[in-house]
Amino acid sequence: MTKAIIPQPRPGIMEISPYVGGESKLAGVDRIIKLSSNEGALGASPRVRDALIASAGEAHRYPDGNATALREALGRTHGLDPARIVCGAGSDELIGLLCRAYAGPGDSIVQSAYGFLMYGIYARGVGAEPILAPESDLTADIDAMLAAVRDTTKLVFLANPNNPTGTCLPTSEVVRLREGLRDDIILVVDAAYAEYVERNDYDAGARLVDSHPNTVMLRTFSKIGLGGLRLGWSYGPAHIIDVLNRVRGPFNICGQALVAGEAALADPAFTDLSRAHNSLWREWTRAKLQAMGIRVGESSGNFVLATFDAEGPFTALAADAALRQQGIICRRVAGYGLPNCLRITIGRDDEMQAVVEALGAFMAGEGR
């Protein structure tokens, strides 16, 4: 029997570690509390649900390939030029388009050490090298990022706020990064968690896009209840938006996602409610965990990062196992280089009370 020939991918592809999302099921457990994927705690706006039901009869129609109505709604909401907005199937797709359009073999991208994993995955996918700049106290270090830049660097990705650490830089530091880069390097400010930031010295990136060359802002609808519909958007200079429109697919966003996005933007009160809920329970959870002796830093996202002991009975793996026994799934972040941490999404009131109760029992040594 002739041995099957296995086609080989391009060099570097097999070096990619596949992205593993937050789990949603546990064997033998019926009631799951999923706090592993940073989804919106309150779900989607009622207007979104109504709009999806109303649009169900149009599922056989191709969507508007230019997302015209959604871009116009985004422009009205944020005071931006719709012509300089491009929408994608989540901001993930837009990260991939930027890498595909501007990087390739022999090139490099720069990101902070604990930045979003997809930057490196997409870079390797096009043959570019991801360079990780060291962080300071789990926070992007602008000096380290600038020092990591090479002649080959085409893109610099900054998640602000960052996932999974929750740390956030003031606008002045982001400006310092942009001004320290060569003009031909594209700075991508990934503001996926912008809705949850509560500080006066923060801008999601739109002003930087307008005031400095070759800067792109990424945003998403995933954190305000539309994660399952995969919808994100970017704002940038006209020449970069033109390039992204040339490399994206013709119908890259489904019609239901477009309708849902417009409905979400039309209900700012629900976004405000989601933000208030997140703020209350994020700080409540942080205080409760700190009182138990668990280290939890400040977070500007819809999650907290809990740090456990490196060894002994109170490790992150042991805490995770204890939570899973109660049907609670949080996010292990060893893949980010943080093996002693768990990322805990802010969920509903009862869910946060359950995770705090379970961790309290764990830290008290119950069940051991």
Curated annotation (Swiss-Prot):
GO terms for biological process: L-histidine biosynthetic process. It catalyses: L-histidinol phosphate + 2-oxoglutarate = 3-(imidazol-4-yl)-2-oxopropyl phosphate + L-glutamate. Belongs to the class-II pyridoxal-phosphate-dependent aminotransferase family. Histidinol-phosphate aminotransferase subfamily. InterPro entries: Aminotransferase_I/II_large (IPR004839), HisP_aminotrans (IPR005861), HistidinolP_aminotransfase (IPR050106), PyrdxlP-dep_Trfase (IPR015424), PyrdxlP-dep_Trfase_major (IPR015421), PyrdxlP-dep_Trfase_small (IPR015422). GO terms for molecular function: histidinol-phosphate transaminase activity; pyridoxal phosphate binding. The gene is hisC. Pathway: Amino-acid biosynthesis; L-histidine biosynthesis; L-histidine from 5-phospho-alpha-D-ribose 1-diphosphate: step 7/9. This is Histidinol-phosphate aminotransferase. Keywords: Amino-acid biosynthesis, Aminotransferase, Histidine biosynthesis, Pyridoxal phosphate, Transferase. It is an enzyme of class 2 (transferase). Homodimer. Disulfide bonds: none annotated. The keyword Transferase applies. The modification N6-(pyridoxal phosphate)lysine is found at K223. Its cofactor is pyridoxal 5'-phosphate. It comes from the Bacteria. Its EC number is 2.6.1.9.
